[in-house]
């Protein structure tokens, strides 16, 4: 089958770009999607444990997760309108298409002034740090002088704030001077090589490329991780208990079939309100959620179909509540094991002061890249942690 030259150019551009992937919570959600994904997640968690110990592991790099917005993609890709490689920017990956000029931005994002403005700034200044040889990178917009989200503060500090967390550094430090003189601040985290992704990229070559662009320092101070024998024992205790609870599941895949998305939504609810996950709590959440599906349809036949589905799902939870109990126990112990590692990463010392509503805060989390190309995020999923505060903001 033949294709037009323009279609070929669109496909060529797509081959070097890709939608910004959702990062899964390490030890937080994969067990709701079956035995195989749970086992892979356990393996990733154990290798982060080895990384923290300084042992050989499959972890390639750990970076600090930046609380910026919007997520973008930029680089030199083929412009279908000209047939040449040009610098362009895309919102949340290339799925919405690249903008190569202001006309493109107007057409794609003219109805969203805030987003249009930020992507326009990335388009204007991003090219100053990206050569055609740098390929395509993904990142987050951390602030700008134009939007007044890069600003000086008392105490001789320079700060950025786009989302929940405010980042602050001494104005007379090397990075502080760069931020003070910049027009925009960007956090770069991923480089694309065809359909391959390189996470937690080395951003050193971008940092001094242009005074107009400040590159957010998202490097982990690995040498400062103080992972003591006591911490290691606490991790191992909860890791072992989680595996024991998984071992009590008679049919892991069958248990979560049809429930995966609801379980994940329920866990977010418990993060938001600080409650402990339980079969009873899940059943209540599920009933309330499915009742909405029943209520919003009009015809008797459709309403009865939705009602039958709800009754079946709730019966399933009640009939297997002992198995859901083991699943939630495993979830709880995995979260505790993960939090031991998270605490050590958080205490390794950050490159910026983090505050939320002028109160000292910890980082949003960390991004862990593995040598097989997989990636996970490590985040405090308590009501008091970043996830809880972000869900409740």
Tell me the role of every PLM-derived stretch:
Residues 3-12:
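Proteolytic processing junctions in secreted/extracellular precursors
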């Amino acid at each position: 089958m033949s294709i037009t030259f323009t279609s070929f150019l669109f496909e060529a551009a797509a081959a070097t770009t890709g939608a910004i992937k959702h990062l899964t919570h390490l030890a937080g959600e994969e067990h709701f999607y079956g035995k195989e994904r749970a086992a892979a997640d356990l393996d990733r968690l154990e290798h982060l444990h080895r990384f923290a110990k300084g042992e050989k592991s499959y972890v390639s790099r750990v970076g600090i997760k930046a609380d910026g917005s919007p997520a973008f993609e930029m680089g030199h890709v083929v412009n279908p309108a000209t047939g040449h490689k040009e610098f362009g920017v895309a919102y949340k990956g290339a799925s919405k298409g690249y903008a190569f000029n202001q006309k493109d931005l107007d057409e794609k994002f003219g109805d969203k002034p805030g987003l249009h403005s930020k992507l326009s700034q990335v388009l204007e200044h991003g090219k100053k740090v990206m050569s055609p040889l740098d390929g395509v990178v993904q990142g987050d917009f951390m602030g700008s002088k134009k939007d007044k989200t890069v600003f000086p503060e008392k105490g001789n500090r320079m700060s950025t704030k786009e989302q929940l967390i405010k980042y602050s550094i001494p104005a007379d430090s090397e990075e502080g001077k760069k931020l003070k003189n910049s027009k925009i601040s960007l956090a770069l985290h991923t480089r694309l090589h065809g359909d391959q992704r390189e996470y937690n990229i080395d951003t050193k070559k971008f940092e001094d490329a242009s005074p107009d662009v400040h590159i957010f320092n998202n490097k982990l101070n690995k040498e400062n991780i103080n992972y003591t024998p006591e911490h290691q024992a606490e991790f191992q205790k909860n890791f072992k208990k989680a595996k024991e609870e998984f071992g009590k599941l008679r049919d892991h895949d069958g248990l979560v079939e049809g429930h995966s998305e609801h379980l994940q939504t329920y866990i977010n609810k418990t993060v938001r309100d600080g409650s402990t996950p339980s079969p009873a709590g899940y059943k209540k959440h599920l009933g309330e959620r499915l009742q909405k599906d029943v209520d919003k349809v009009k015809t008797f036949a459709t309403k009865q179909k939705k009602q039958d589905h709800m009754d079946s799902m709730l019966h399933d939870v009640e009939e297997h509540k002992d198995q859901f109990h083991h699943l939630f126990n495993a979830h709880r112990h995995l979260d505790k094991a993960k939090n031991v590692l998270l605490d050590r990463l958080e205490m390794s010392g950050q490159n910026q002061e983090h505050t939320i509503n002028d109160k000292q805060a910890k980082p949003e989390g960390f991004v862990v890249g593995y040598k097989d190309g997989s990636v996970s995020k490590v985040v405090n999923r308590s009501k008091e942690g970043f996830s809880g505060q972000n869900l409740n903001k």
